[in-house]
Amino acid sequence: TMLFDSVAFKNIISNGLVLDKNGNKMSKRLGNAVDPFEVLEKYGTDAVRWYMISNSQPWDNLKFDVDGVDEVRRKFFGTLYNTYSFFALYANVDGFTGREAEIPVAERPEIDRWIISLLNTLVKEVTESLENYDPTPAARAIQDFVNENLSNWYVRLNRKRFWGGG
């Protein structure tokens, strides 16, 4: 670049065409075009970006479906938000500050060791995928971890414990 006498980007990933949900080219004339500003306003940029990166590889054509964006917003971001809200509520009730002494992993309950192990595996998988410029499997792995392991298993099996009853 002009400022730093170096290239602006070392690597670029370019996406393919964004098609309608049936795989046809979007066109105002055909009535299948989507106003991106309306979609961003209604669902938010994070949901749109996540939908696009998790739905298909960036270099493949993307069959864009607004219902898919809504599903990502509800099922992934909604689950992530609810999981965090659950944690924040009970952490505040218990006076958790994050400055407590760290409990060694070996001394934690088995279910805590399980989720930590899965998280470490997830970090490794996501790092490898991103280093190989393969973002879609990384996004899908994160989504699966949040929806299935963190929310459906870990939080549900630990509710009584988090509520102070176990």
Would you name each region that the model predicts?
Residues 4-166:
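Long, charged, mostly alpha-helical binding arms that flank functional sites
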